[in-house]
Amino acid sequence: MRSDIKSYTLSGMGCSASALAIDMAQNLLKIHRNSHAIVLSTEILSNGFYSGNDRSKLLLNCLFRTGSAAILLSNTKEAKEYSKYKLLRTLRTQRAFEDKAYHSAFREEDSEGKLGFTLKRDLLQVAGETLKSNITVLGSSMLPLSEKVWHGVSIFWKKIY
């Protein structure tokens, strides 16, 4: 590989590594002018495939598969003219500081000693709360001031009545 090419590997994080990689590429493009960044993301289930009988671990085999995606990010003048999309901002939220969220999905051995990924029933609630906090942060950064004021007034009235 040429000396002017940098390569980074984020592994063991599943599809969540894609958001990290795009955020990292965006930050690198802020530093390096007239550059390109390619983000290649793959998710390979074979590493986490579970062959045991524990139902809480079998669900992962049904939900996730092998897949991939790629995106080219650029900050060149030509890219501004010809690109179809523009990355305005990236946003990541996490809830691992809450015990319920932290323990909703984890890797452990079953009673037979087979390694599997356990998904708890709390996962859907945690995912909903994470999505809500993500939309809250995104809305506050994108909505115009008039909409923010209207939202504040509506919350105020709901608390009073």
For each feature predicted by the language model, list its residue ranges.
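Conserved catalytic cysteine-centered active-site region
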Residues: 1-35, 47-48
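Short glycine-aspartate micro-motif
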Residues: 37-39
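Hydrophobic pocket-lining "lid/loop/helix" segments that shape and contact the acyl-thioester
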Residues: 42-161
